[in-house]
């Protein structure tokens, strides 16, 4: 069935025209297919001045049709601002803090293609952007610098200021990319549950994120934290990976801490006693690695707002550390570059307040002819610096391969 859907996506005449056009568009992988958003009537660039107004606006909106929603992303820095955490980092390429779009056309690709559109006539301007690689990838910090940050955080862990913290490294090159081409290649080689692509006039994002941060339908909310990574080998399988995670003290500690933190985050917005683990400590398999996952759910308190839920759940604890606020403060003291999209969240908010957001990891950001790929691995009390540094490369590998 997956191949059949891929075939329809690739060769449907309408979609081919859309892919080859200059229209901004978004593709989001869903459980049984893909949703494509385009013909945007509004584009909201988030900032400190408008983030509260944007989130509060959903309390007054009415849902009448499928296109009554916003789709887009929150960057890492704007989420810190929402929590009242100061950031003094600088970025070579100052990127958007977050962008949300109001679509007038949504194309749902399942066994068949369904189009929901407020546009009477579809117009396409032919456009094709080839991929150009102008320089090789360079890592923003070498191992010696990483080790220095690692040692600082290890000391903070021994002092009890944090229990786990995730150090970010970036691969960066000079390039322009065709995001449509990159996205479908990635879906063929490394499709993940929360994959997405954004093609805008002056930037693009391609992601094979595996992690669902929150899924809200009505008063029910679900989160699926990932904590635990194992590199694949020729002999490994899900059973051997599960055995490894269960027998590995470091991985078990890390997973338990993150699950407890996500349960705590949910408890702040849910009815007391309703937060529960639906599926505990199972393995998901990807091209280069295995992940250790738990599914948690709860029933939202009556009258809970979109802003309250976002502030409670973001940034996702599994890619930050524990406890969240103090760990964010420590990270921002040591990381000298903006994370931009990395460890932010992409998804949609419907006018009926249903929403779905991932954690933005395993992603390429292309902006001003520069591509950057970020990765982060967890530091706990008994972590080894070299192993965590190398794990970042494993996580970035499937994206780096797209540029070959």
What are these regions (language model features)?
Residues 1-404:
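Extended alpha-helical targeting/anchoring segments
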């Amino acid at each position: 069935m997956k191949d059949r859907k891929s075939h329809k996506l690739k060769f449907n005449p309408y979609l081919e025209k859309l892919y080859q056009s200059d229209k901004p568009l978004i593709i989001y992988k869903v459980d049984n297919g893909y949703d494509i958003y385009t013909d945007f009537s509004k584009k909201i660039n988030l900032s400190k001045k408008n983030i509260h107004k944007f989130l509060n606006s959903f309390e007054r909106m009415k849902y009448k049709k499928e296109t009554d929603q916003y789709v887009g992303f929150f960057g890492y820095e704007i989420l810190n601002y929402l929590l009242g955490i100061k950031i003094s980092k600088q970025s070579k390429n100052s990127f958007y803090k977050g962008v949300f779009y109001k679509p007038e056309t949504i194309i749902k690709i399942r066994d068949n293609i369904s189009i929901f559109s407020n546009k009477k006539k579809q117009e396409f301007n032919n456009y094709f952007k080839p991929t150009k690689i102008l320089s090789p990838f360079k890592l923003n910090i070498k191992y010696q610098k990483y080790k220095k940050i690692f040692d600082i955080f290890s000391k903070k862990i021994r002092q009890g200021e944090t229990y786990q913290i995730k150090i970010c490294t970036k691969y960066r090159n000079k390039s322009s990319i065709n995001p449509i081409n990159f996205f479908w290649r990635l879906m063929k080689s490394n499709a993940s549950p929360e994959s997405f692509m954004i093609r805008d006039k002056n930037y693009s994002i391609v992601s094979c994120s595996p992690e669902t941060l929150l899924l809200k339908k009505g008063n029910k909310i679900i989160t699926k934290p990932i904590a635990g990574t194992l590199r694949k080998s020729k002999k490994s399988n899900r059973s051997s990976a599960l055995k490894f995670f269960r027998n590995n003290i470091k991985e078990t500690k890390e997973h338990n801490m993150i699950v407890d933190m996500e349960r705590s985050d949910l408890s702040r917005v849910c009815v007391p006693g309703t937060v529960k683990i639906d599926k505990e400590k199972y393995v998901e398999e990807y091209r280069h690695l295995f992940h250790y996952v738990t599914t948690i759910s709860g029933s939202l308190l009556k009258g809970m707002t979109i802003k309250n839920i976002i502030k409670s759940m973001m940034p996702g604890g599994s890619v930050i550390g524990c406890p969240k606020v103090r760990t964010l403060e420590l990270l921002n003291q040591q990381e000298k570059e903006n994370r931009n999209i990395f460890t932010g969240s992409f998804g949609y908010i419907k006018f009926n307040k249903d929403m779905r957001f991932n954690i933005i990891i395993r992603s390429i950001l292309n902006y001003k002819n520069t591509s950057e790929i970020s990765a982060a691995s967890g530091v706990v009390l008994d972590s080894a610096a070299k192993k965590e540094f190398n794990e970042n490369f494993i996580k970035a590998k499937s994206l780096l391969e797209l540029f070959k």
